[in-house]
Design a protein with these regions (language model features):
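C-terminal interaction module
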Residues: 1-41, 139-169
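Glycine-rich, often proline-containing surface loops adjacent to acidic residues and nearby aromatics
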Residues: 1-7, 88-108
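Residue-identity detector for threonine
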Residues: 3, 7, 23, 47, ...
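Alpha-helix boundary/N-cap detector
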Residues: 11, 15-19, 54, 108, ...
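Short linear motifs in intrinsically disordered/low-complexity regions
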Residues: 18, 33, 47, 66, ...
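N-terminal low-complexity, intrinsically disordered segments
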Residues: 21-88
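Aromatic/basic-lined ligand-recognition segments
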Residues: 60, 65-99, 131-169
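Surface-exposed beta-loop interaction hotspot
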Residues: 104-146
Length: 169
C-alpha cells in the first residue's frame, strides 16, 4: 500500500494548550478522519503502550511533561489488525530527534489539501527547517526513513525537498 509523507526536520515548538490538539485534529479532519489511538514516549518511563484517543487531562498531562520525547497519533479503520501497518494517517512528533512526519495512506489524502496540511504542520516548527515530501510503500515503514535510521528503500520516491526559511517582512 503506497503512502505519501510530509516530513519536517528541525526544532519543534512545544505546545501544551488546546491549539496543539486542535491543529492535529484539523489535519485528520481534512482527510475526513478522526484520531483513533495515540502513543507517547517520556524519558525514563515505559510508556510505549497505545491508548484510545480521547481529549482530556491524561493527554494534557503527557503534552505538558518536560520529559516528553515523542507523541504519535493514528487513525485506523474499524477492522484493523496492526496499527503499524493498517493506519490511514499517522502523525509522529519527535522532540528528542527534532522531526515530525505525517504519513497518509495514498487513497485517503485529498491532494487539494496538501498545501493546507503543510501550513498546519508548519505551525509546529521553528524556522528554518527542512521539509520533504515523498511516497513509499507502507511495508517499508516510512517512519524509518523520516528518522534517518535506514536509507536503502526500494519504493521511495522524493517528490520535493526544500529548506523553509524565515518569513521576512
Amino acid at each position: 500500500m503506497e503512502t505519501i509523507s510530509i516530513t519536517n526536520r528541525g526544532s519543534i515548538r512545544k505546545f501544551v494548550d488546546d491549539v496543539f490538539i486542535d491543529t492535529i485534529e484539523n489535519i485528520y479532519a481534512l482527510c475526513d478522519l478522526k484520531i483513533s489511538y495515540y502513543g507517547v514516549s517520556i524519558a525514563y518511563k515505559n510508556t510505549g503502550q497505545l491508548k484510545k484517543y480521547k481529549r482530556g487531562k491524561i493527554l494534557h498531562n503527557y503534552l505538558s511533561n518536560n520529559e516528553l520525547e515523542r507523541i504519535n497519533f493514528f487513525s485506523v479503520p474499524d477492522d484493523f489488525v496492526t496499527v503499524a501497518y493498517d493506519y490511514l494517517l499517522s502523525i509522529s512528533i519527535n522532540y528528542k530527534n527534532n522531526f515530525m512526519t505525517a504519513t497518509f495512506d495514498k487513497n485517503i489524502i485529498n491532494h487539494e489539501c496538501i498545501e493546507e496540511i503543510k501550513t498546519l504542520l508548519d505551525t509546529f516548527m521553528e524556522k528554518a527547517y527542512m521539509q520533504e515530501i515523498y511516497t513509499m510503500d507502507k511495508e517499508e515503514t516510512p517512519l524509518l526513513y523520516a528518522m534517518g535510521i535506514k536509507s536503502d528503500f526500494k519504493t521511495i520516491k522524493i517528490l520535493s525537498s526544500e529548506a523553509v526559511k524565515e518569513d521576512y517582512v
